[in-house]
């Protein structure tokens, strides 16, 4: 049986310029898995803590102080890797080691196992499952916590090239729409300065409806059928709109409020009107 023979970590910077952690796991002295951990801009209160209170440095110190616990483990046995992590941190929300570090350890072990066995990564996770083509999701328009004042309340408008036959075509189609959306916004608003949110989506001064309309227009300008060749998605990030005292969703930029029932109708209308293939966090928590 193969064994983990080395584990290490380091502090790196993510695309927002914030510190995160990267973990290396080596199996049988040769097969390296390396993973850097993501973390979101808007998080829920039930979500695993990305890092302990003192940040990724505390995660890294805990990893290094407990690295010997992983040595000799089978990298293909994800349950055993998880169990080791839980001996280090038994808190409900990973507040000691951080969910980001736990994620990086688990996926680095899986990547190391895949290289060890010379199989694709997914074969380690699900060796006997049906294969389906994954559609990469691209962020084309940002609002909410990802962009500045005047942008939409909803956090992201995304696309998936659901008509693509290959990963190359899917990425190419996503990029085409991203570029066309900039052109479409510029024609609609000559004052647009090509501003972007922190994940690369364009950040125009539009309300929710206008942002969705112009995103759909950009898709159709390229000759694609909305909901067929290219589909829209929305990350509502509704917890950022939720007001606990009022028990309502406050859309301050658009100038309206939703009670919980109205919020469900609001999201359902967008899903139906724009033929969404993807909807994230449409309600609080």
Where do the protein language model's features map onto the residues?
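Hydrophobic faces of well-ordered beta-strands that scaffold small-molecule active sites
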Residues: 136-141, 194-204, 228-234, 279-280
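Short, Gly/Pro- and small/polar-rich lid/capping loops
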Residues: 1-20
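Mobile "lid/hinge" segments at catalytic clefts and subdomain interfaces of large enzymes
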Residues: 131-197
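Metal- or metallocofactor-binding catalytic centers and their adjacent structured scaffolds
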Residues: 38-119, 171
């Amino acid at each position: 049986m193969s064994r983990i023979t080395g584990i290490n970590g380091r502090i790196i910077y993510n695309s927002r310029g914030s510190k995160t952690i990267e973990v290396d796991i080596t199996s049988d002295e040769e097969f390296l898995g390396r993973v850097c951990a993501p973390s979101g801009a808007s998080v829920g209160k039930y979500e695993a803590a990305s890092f302990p209170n003192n940040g990724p440095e505390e995660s890294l110190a805990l990893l290094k102080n407990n690295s010997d616990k992983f040595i000799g483990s089978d990298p293909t046995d994800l349950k055993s890797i998880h169990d080791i992590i839980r001996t280090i941190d038994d808190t409900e929300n990973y507040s000691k080691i951080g969910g980001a570090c736990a994620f990086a350890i688990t996926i680095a072990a899986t990547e190391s196992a895949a290289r060890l066995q010379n199989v694709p990564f997914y074969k380690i996770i699900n060796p006997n499952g049906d294969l389906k083509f994954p559609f990469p999701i691209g962020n084309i328009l940002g609002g909410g916590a990802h962009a500045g004042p005047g942008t939409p309340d909803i956090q992201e408008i995304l696309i998936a090239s659901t008509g693509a036959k290959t990963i190359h075509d899917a990425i190419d189609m996503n990029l085409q729409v991203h570029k066309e959306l900039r052109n479409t916004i510029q024609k609609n608003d000559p004052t647009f300065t090509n501003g972007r949110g922190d994940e690369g989506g364009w950040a125009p001064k539009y309300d929710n409806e206008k942002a969705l309309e112009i995103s759909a227009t950009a898709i159709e300008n390229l000759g694609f059928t909305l909901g067929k060749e290219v589909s829209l998605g929305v990350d509502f990030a509704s917890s950022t709109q939720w007001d606990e005292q009022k028990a309502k969703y406050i859309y301050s930029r658009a100038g309206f409020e939703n009670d919980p029932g109205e919020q469900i109708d609001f999201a359902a209308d967008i899903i139906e009107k724009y033929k969404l293939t993807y909807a994230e966090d449409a309600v609080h928590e």
